[in-house]
Amino acid sequence: MEGSYLSAQENQPIPERLIPRSNSTSNLFALSSTFSKLNVRNDADYNYSNPNKKRHIYSGEIDCRSVTAARKFPVRSCSMTAAQQRKRTALFTVRERNSYHEGFNNDQDYVSQYQKPQYTFGVYKELTPYQLQRSKMKRSFQFPNGEIYKPKLDGKCTHSLKKPELNSRDSSLFKFSEKKGRNLSKDFVGPHNGTSVIHIPPNDTGYGVNSLELNTSVPSTIKSSVSSTSPISAVNTLTSLPESQTDDDDGYENKTVTISYCFENTVNEKHGSHIEKLDLSTKEKTKPTTNSGLFDRKKKTILGTEKYRCIKSQSKLKLGSVLKKLWRTSGNSNTKHGKKDTKRRRIPIDDMVTHSDGNSEAENDIELMDANLDGIEFDDDETLMDTDSIFDDLLSKENDKYDLRRRQLEIRQKLHETSHNDDGKVSFRDTEKHNVNEGLIDKTIIEEFSKLGEYIIDTRNQPPPRSSKRPSLDDNESARYFYNISTDLRQSLSGPISLPMHVGNDMVNRLRNDWEYIRFEDRRNSLPDSSFDKVETPPKPIKKDVRFAKEVCLASTWSSNAYERANPEFIMNRHRLLWMMKVHPSMNSAMNEIKLELNSYKKNEMVVHENSKCFTHYLI
């Protein structure tokens, strides 16, 4: 994979005061041979020549003089915000210095022996969609649906504090300067192996890097030859795209970086190799400036962030209001609760990292959101009313279930207490309760329930009332003969009927009123004789069909009139009684006594099969 191109404007004029005073101008572009590694191209030459042509700049044989790169290299168009554009442009800016002689000559008298060439280039490539999204997520923005995204501020600049890993091919070391305007002395000269030091002065804004300075001491008496093995050390920007170093031969993603070209300097051995190490001081990088404007923006950002977090907490207002109502026992507790909320929502200033460009957009979004939500007030009373009704319904259901089980147990206990003893006496406890509740009994209700006695029939002592349509037989023998005699004569009731023995005309006349045909079965004739028991006759197949019979078969059963049904008036009275109990709860005491009596009857007096007693229903 080929490396990225370096674009520059060839026809851009160089300021006169930045041109070094030299007798020869042919060595102004004597640069490192590492340019051939980067495949540096010129836009002007690229336009009129073949697009595949790559213009290389090789180093010359003569003395190396200072060269100052042009300001504001052209930036490839990409989808980025204005704040990110300004940060990237800051890397292409060359910090002007008063002197090229290590800061000691202030009258702009250039000395040809010690002149410091400064090179600052931006190596970049078109960002991938993943990189664009990642750079976008580093600052706050607003979604199309109105929601505001803001990155989490944990109070630590993890990207700037991360120590860059030095590649095996990178031998250059870095140092972030701690004082403004500090320069390297003449004694600190890059060693013979090609190492160099990048000097990054602090900027005025206090959060990024505006310029980078490359300080190398090159004696004029010795020709500076550029080492072909000099590596390229990349420093990532502190505020955006914090990735590892990029190399042209690697397949890593190219980001906006700053390239320092390392020159091989031939010096005396007495100077030694002085290498300044990387300073990872957290206090210096995150030290707030004394600028009043920056302090105001920081304070405004903190307030905006606090309001934004308060707005997010308002989504939990409904549940919080319910909890407040439960916890609100006194005025002091309410005051303490408010203090706790204030402490919980307070954000320490040390945990905030201000970005002047990125936070300006976030401040505008937060201020706009605060202006829209200032006049909104939440009605806690309505929320509490709705919540209370829900809780009341849930509690009432639970109470009903509990009361149902409790009442069932009480009924069984009362029935056990009111059970008669062997002497037929009622327990003393039940008698005492009856005396206490005697004054609460409503006579009208008792009268309504007294009608039940008319429909209660004791089936143990007497049979149900005899139906008028039931045939009357004198004795069991005649009844047996009546049910066993059968005839195949199907005659009309209008014609004469051959009656069997012991069947009177009066019974036949009664049956005519209900049925058209009357069949008499004589089981004595149908029974097989004992002499034919040994003879086996093959069974004849019986044809099964469905038909509507016009005859009746008499059997020992009861007629429909023998079973009395409930009176509709009683059902209406029962519904009216239940409605009165619901309207007047005071009637419950009298009703409970009646229910207790009915339940006692069901348990002790009502005749129930032994296997069906477990299915008995009691009134509750």
From Swiss-Prot:
Any single GO BP term: protein localization to bud neck
GO terms, molecular function: actin binding
Keyword Phosphoprotein assigned: yes
Compositionally biased tracts (Polar residues): 1-12
List of residues that carry Phosphoserine: S472, S526
Region called Disordered, residue ranges: 1-20
Induction of synthesis: By pheromone (alpha-factor).
GO cellular component: mating projection base; peroxisome
Keywords: Phosphoprotein
Top-level taxon in the UniProt lineage: Eukaryota
Phosphoprotein in keyword set: yes
Similarity comment: family membership: To yeast YER158C.
Job of this protein: Acts in conjunction with the alpha-factor receptor to promote morphogenesis and adaptation.
Name of this chain's protein: Protein AFR1
Organism: Saccharomyces cerevisiae (strain ATCC 204508 / S288c)
Lineage: Eukaryota, Fungi, Dikarya, Ascomycota, Saccharomycotina
Gene encoding the protein: AFR1
